[in-house]
Amino acid sequence: HRRHNLDIDPESLVFSTGVVPAISSVIRKLSTPAEKVLVMTPVYNIFFNSIVNNGRQVLESPLVYDGEQYGIDFNDLESKLADPQTTLMILCNPHNPIGRLWSREELLRIGELCAKYQVVVIADEIHCDLTDPQVEYIPFASVSSVCENLSVTCLAPTKTFNLAGLQTAAIVVANPNLR
């Protein structure tokens, strides 16, 4: 991940058969039945399946559309992160399906809010290499030590290089307590 300024310690790597199985495994490991997993909608529909099929509740924080692009309603996001039953957030970065690359400031604010309410971020960053070259992709974990310590980042070559049959993914978990 040298090209995206994310320093990955080999000890922080865990491997999986894919990003979706990894997300499901993390949901099972880091939450309990009936807890809530937050997603910013619209979002990749499989996230809902991964949450519900593991006995957790989906909590939606709708993105707001200003006529040109989608953005985060930080007031809504914070109110939902403040719910004590919200223990995980799935962050799609870049966002699927809207294609939005989140700014460093937006990612930092998400990280600070999640730290404030002790919510772990599952960062699905499988589309990191399929972006507009004019817009910088910023890995969530690279934004700050706070973001790095509360995140589980899921990556795979399968989308970018059309290798779906390979069934592989890497999960980056810097915090040994989450690993």
Where are these regions (language model features)?
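Conserved core of the PLP fold type I
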Residues: H1-E112, D129-L130, Y137-S142
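Residue-level marker for buried hydrophobic side chains located in beta-strands
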Residues: N93, V121-I122
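Metal-dependent active-site segment of extracytoplasmic phospho-/sulfohydrolases and closely related
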Residues: Q118-V120, T131
